[in-house]
Amino acid sequence: MRPLSVQGAWLSETRAFADDRGEFQELYSARSLRGALGYDPGVAQVNRSVSRRGVLRGVHFAQLPPSQAKYVTCLSGAVLDVVVDIRTGSPTYRAWEAVRLDDPHRSLYVEAGLGHSFMALTDDAVVVYLTSQGYAAGREHGVHPLDPDLGIAWPDGIEPVLSEKDRQAPGIAEMERRGLLPDYEECLAFRRSLCERGTG
């Protein structure tokens, strides 16, 4: 587990074991995650998406608490996966980091309170993500992924394909004005409570 530049985001790289029968790989290890985070976020739901080239999903997040941590793996094809610091008061507020996921040996962990988005770089890009909480429509929010205030460097030469919901999402300044973004100190307090309990 390697921490990324946005606090609360981690890159996990796992090994595969191959022989003449094929290959075996451990995609997710609660022990490894607990060792890095200090708590086990738990798995409440497993989601799978299949996207054609150019599909752009996000920037999504859920209200805190409990919000929704994600463990993201691209099983086939390729995506540019982006974590965004949308926590007001954070020293890296509005910062983002992009990771190309095109190998199931690499996964991205996105802590509760952070924003998450990805663009499919190929057709039939299959992404599986484990979430610490189930989907709760009334607590789900989004920031427009093409918001110039975020300035995410999506790949040139690929026309973004957005859902109507994501296309209508406000920019980060408007979300901050509405008071809908997570607060950094509240996120830290929530994280401390998880560490004290040892689980999400």
UniProtKB/Swiss-Prot annotation:
EC identifiers of the protein: 5.1.3.13
Gene Ontology biological process: dTDP-rhamnose biosynthetic process; polysaccharide biosynthetic process; streptomycin biosynthetic process
Residues annotated as binding substrate: 21, 26, 45-47, 57, 70, 116, 140, 165
Site feature (Participates in a stacking interaction with the thymidine ring of dTDP-4-oxo-6-deoxyglucose) residues: 135
Gene Ontology molecular function: any one: dTDP-4-dehydrorhamnose 3,5-epimerase activity
Coiled coil ranges: none
Protein name: dTDP-4-dehydrorhamnose 3,5-epimerase
Organism, scientific name: Streptomyces griseus
